[in-house]
Every structure is written in C-alpha cells, then in structure tokens.
Amino acid sequence: MVHFTAEEKAAITSLWGKMNVEEAGGEALGRLLVVYPWTQRFFDNFGNLSSPSAILGNPKVKAHGKKVLTSFGDAIKNMDNLKTTFAKLSELHCDKLHVDPENFRLLGNVMVIILATHFGKEFTPEVQAAWQKLVSAVAIALGHKYH
C-alpha cells in the first residue's frame, strides 16, 4: 500500500480542484492514442483514429477521456485504498478487455504531462512528485488483477 503524506494529498487535491475533467480527460486519452498508437487497438469502435487531428477531435475519445479522468477523481477521494477502489476496473481491463497493464503506466505519465501543460509554474517539482506517486499507485492498482 502506498502512503501519501498530508503535503502530497494537499498538492494533489489542490490541483484537482482546478481541473477541467472533460477537457483534460479528452486531451490525456487523445495524447495516449497519438503518442502510443498501439493503444488504439482497444478502441476499435471509436471511429476515425487515422491522424492526430482525427483522434484529438473525436467525440468518443473525449467522452471516454472524461470517464477515465473521473476515475482519477475516485483515486483522489480514496488515496489510502486504491486497490479496493480500482478492483472492478482492474478485473474489467484484465478479464474482458485484455488491456496490457503497461498502458496504465503510460496513461499516468501522459496525465502528468497534461497537468504540467495546464498548470505551468504551479506544477512545481514537489507537486509533480506527488502526482507521479499517485498515477503510479493507480497503475499498480489497475494492474492488480493481472498478478
């Protein structure tokens, strides 16, 4: 289990409170699909993913990105119990969707990039460290069913 200090929790929740989940979610998933094109195979039903502009403008990518980022909100509310929080999602992604758990780590890293671009100087090294710890812990929790 990962332990978050009071300072880390404050850094995470402070930024999260300013996050536009819909905008950042679509941007994060879109960036994942552009930068790591092999992840597109999990989104066959999303329509046109033929180019970066098609991906970033795709309404299904934006909608699912919002859903993904909303799940990060659950992580923030349950930082001390991530394994239980993501148990059902881990099972879904492992047993039904067969998603490579490495993709969770990649998405977490993309999330950190999105935060840095959205928050600039406010995204200090200390804030980045807290968020990196969170996205890593979420990736481990999502990959739990695979072990």
Curated annotation (Swiss-Prot):
The UniProt record lists the keyword Lipid metabolism: no
This protein's record includes keyword Cell inner membrane: no
Keyword terms of this UniProt record: Heme, Iron, Metal-binding, Oxygen transport, Phosphoprotein, Transport
Annotated disulfide bonds: none
GO MF, one annotated term: metal ion binding
Annotated GO CC locations: blood microparticle; haptoglobin-hemoglobin complex; hemoglobin complex
SUPFAM superfamilies on file: Globin-like
Ligand binding (heme b): 64, 93
Globin domain span: 3-147
Pfam families linked: Globin (PF00042)
Subunit structure: Heterotetramer of two alpha chains and two epsilon chains in early embryonic hemoglobin Gower-2; two zeta chains and two epsilon chains in early embryonic hemoglobin Gower-1.
Family indicated by similarity: Belongs to the globin family.
PANTHER family: HEMOGLOBIN FAMILY MEMBER, HEMOGLOBIN SUBUNIT EPSILON
Protein name per UniProt: Hemoglobin subunit epsilon
Name of the gene: HBE1
